[in-house]
């Protein structure tokens, strides 16, 4: 756990996050996007909880859960296709946001922002967004992080958020390298 969190700063950061108008507006937009995505194939779509805070080693997140009852005979692959990518990686309106991402980002995101999971033989679908993960390709290790940039964004705050997200990955590399040296 981050030393700042254990020194009691976690509560300060939590209050700052909950009071941040941009973060709250962004989160509300993402919850609405999730509701809209699920409404395509679900009934009884509801928000189970809204804007809970979850602490991770280097970041604090606002977390909500949106759920619904999948309509009978819904194809799980179509359900995945119609809800992918998650709004947290695209923004809204989703189609236009994806067009802008394709236009402005200098390269394809690859595995980042994709998903990993399974579709069971019984139609069960379970997947997770591939963020804060490593990709090993041709002897090189790749990792990345991002954030929601909007007109109201504060550049320094957004950069710090990305660096905080990358902090856990950098820490994992440091720990792996130190174990490698011990075992050498």
Give the location of each predicted region.
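Extended alpha-helical targeting/anchoring segments
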Residues: 1, 7-184
């Amino acid at each position: 756990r981050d030393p700042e969190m254990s020194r009691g700063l976690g509560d300060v950061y939590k209050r700052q996050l909950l009071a941040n108008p941009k973060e709250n507006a962004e989160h509300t937009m993402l919850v609405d996007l999730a509701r809209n995505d699920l409404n395509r194939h679900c009934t009884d779509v509801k928000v189970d909880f809204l804007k809970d805070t979850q602490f991770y080693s280097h970041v604090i997140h606002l977390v909500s859960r949106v759920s619904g009852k999948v309509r009978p005979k819904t194809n799980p692959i179509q359900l995945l296709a119609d809800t992918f990518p998650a709004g947290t990686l695209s923004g809204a309106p989703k189609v236009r946001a994806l067009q802008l991402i394709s236009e402005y980002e200098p390269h394809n995101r690859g595995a980042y922002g994709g998903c990993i999971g399974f579709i069971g033989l019984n139609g069960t679908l379970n997947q997770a967004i591939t963020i804060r993960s490593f990709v090993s390709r041709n002897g090189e290790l790749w990792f990345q992080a991002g954030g929601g940039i909007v007109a109201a964004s504060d550049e320094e705050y957004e950069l710090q958020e990305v660096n905080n997200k990358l902090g856990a990955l950098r820490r994992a590399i440091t720990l792996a390298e130190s174990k490698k040296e011990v075992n050498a």
